[in-house]
């Protein structure tokens, strides 16, 4: 289908079939469409509203072109859409560190900041972690520690074709939705935070289509009326849970798990160095209660998604024990040491 027909279909407000979306995305990623055409397609898709079928089609196209890595399908990815503009510190990254120290295998897919002051790649780098290890080094790190960070540009090189267009457009597009879905390790267990409650249904359908084994899709609100793509410490957290094809929905509050309420301002972060300092304080036990509780709440959900915890309450106990025993700080320091050794090893091979 030529670009003109694709554009005409979107102008008429019609949805693409999965096959049409695969064709469209293949042409974009293979450089067969000009930047002007790509911009028009992305803007029209966004105006019409992206469907689960279109998202699944884009997923299949991008995963076909991705540099995939074989780790462990049962590893957990903690990844959010971003875009909530709440300015919280890197909670899901912190949770991945604590969960890993509790025995959860982590395959975290992430990138530098897009909508926030500090993305997962930025804060890990500030903590001393080499984010751009080659895949074979990342595999070694995972085998030794059960932790992997998958830096998106390394595994999705074709995405560089759309980066200038996305920057120039300056609006959310289908690519903002795709980020949490296109984990190059094909992780089948995911904790996904979304900035808009309407996206929960879309993610549910796409995760079911693409074979998620267990997933939690989370959207929350603060008492101040701010939307969050992570659990809330002072308002409702809406959850859609997927487990072997079965979908359940529920809403929880921090006090359901014995957590105190904290205002949004208490869990807001800043630039990469500030957020790295917050994570270090959480790990060494010197953090304020709000920072600690935000990390524990998300970690509890990651432990539950992994199957290590029977429920969120159980996950909270597991997370708290790992953190308060010093296990989390010790394990993360071990990860940093292995990461540095692998960075030196593979740099010397390249040189």
Swiss-Prot record:
One of its GO terms (biological process) is L-tryptophan biosynthetic process. Its EC number is 2.4.2.18. Pfam families: Glycos_trans_3N, Glycos_transf_3. 5-phospho-alpha-D-ribose 1-diphosphate binds at residues 80, 83-84, 88, 90-93, 108-116, 120. GO terms for molecular function: anthranilate phosphoribosyltransferase activity; magnesium ion binding. Binds 2 magnesium ions per monomer. It catalyses: N-(5-phospho-beta-D-ribosyl)anthranilate + diphosphate = 5-phospho-alpha-D-ribose 1-diphosphate + anthranilate. Mg(2+) 2 binds at residues 229-230. Its cofactor is Mg(2+). Mg(2+) 1 binds at residues 92, 230. One of its GO terms (cellular component) is cytosol. Pathway: Amino-acid biosynthesis; L-tryptophan biosynthesis; L-tryptophan from chorismate: step 2/5. Keywords: Amino-acid biosynthesis, Aromatic amino acid biosynthesis, Glycosyltransferase, Magnesium, Metal-binding, Transferase, Tryptophan biosynthesis. Anthranilate 2 binds at residue 166. Belongs to the anthranilate phosphoribosyltransferase family. Homodimer. This is Anthranilate phosphoribosyltransferase.
């Amino acid at each position: 289908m030529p670009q003109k027909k694709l554009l005409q279909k979107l102008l008429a407000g019609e949805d693409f079939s999965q096959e049409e979306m695969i064709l469209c995305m293949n042409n974009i990623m293979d450089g067969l469409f000009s930047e002007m055409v790509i911009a028009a397609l992305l803007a029209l898709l966004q105006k019409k509203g992206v469907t689960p079928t279109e998202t699944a089609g884009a997923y299949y196209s991008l995963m076909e072109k991705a540099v995939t890595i074989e780790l462990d399908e049962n590893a957990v990815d903690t990844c959010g859409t971003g875009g909530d503009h709440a300015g919280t510190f890197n909670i899901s990254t912190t949770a991945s560190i604590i969960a890993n120290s509790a025995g959860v295998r982590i395959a975290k897919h992430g990138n530098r900041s897009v909508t926030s002051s500090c993305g997962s790649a930025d804060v890990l780098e500030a903590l001393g972690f080499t984010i751009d290890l080659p895949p074979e080094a990342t595999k070694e790190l995972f085998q030794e520690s059960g932790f992997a960070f998958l830096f998106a540009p390394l595994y999705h090189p074709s995405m560089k074709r759309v980066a200038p267009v996305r920057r120039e457009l300056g609006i959310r597009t289908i690519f903002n939705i795709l980020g949490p879905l296109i984990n190059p390790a094909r992780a089948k267990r995911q904790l996904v935070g979304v900035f808009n409650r309407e996206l929960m249904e879309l993610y549910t359908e796409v995760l079911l289509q693409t074979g998620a084994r267990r997933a939690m899709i989370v959207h929350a609100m603060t008492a101040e009326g701010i939307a969050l793509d992570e659990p809330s410490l002072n308002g409702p957290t809406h959850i859609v849970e997927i487990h072997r094809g079965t979908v359940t929905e529920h809403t929880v509050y921090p006090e359901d798990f014995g957590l105190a309420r904290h205002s949004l301002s208490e869990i807001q972060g800043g630039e990469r160095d500030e957020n790295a300092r917050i994570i270090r304080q959480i790990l060494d036990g010197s953090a304020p209660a709000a920072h600690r509780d935000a990390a524990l709440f998300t970690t509890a959900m990651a432990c539950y998604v992994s199957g290590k915890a029977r429920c969120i309450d159980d996950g909270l106990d597991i997370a708290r024990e790992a953190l308060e025993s010093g296990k989390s700080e010790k394990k993360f320091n071990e990860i940093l040491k292995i990461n540095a050794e692998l960075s030196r090893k593979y740099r010397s091979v390249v040189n």
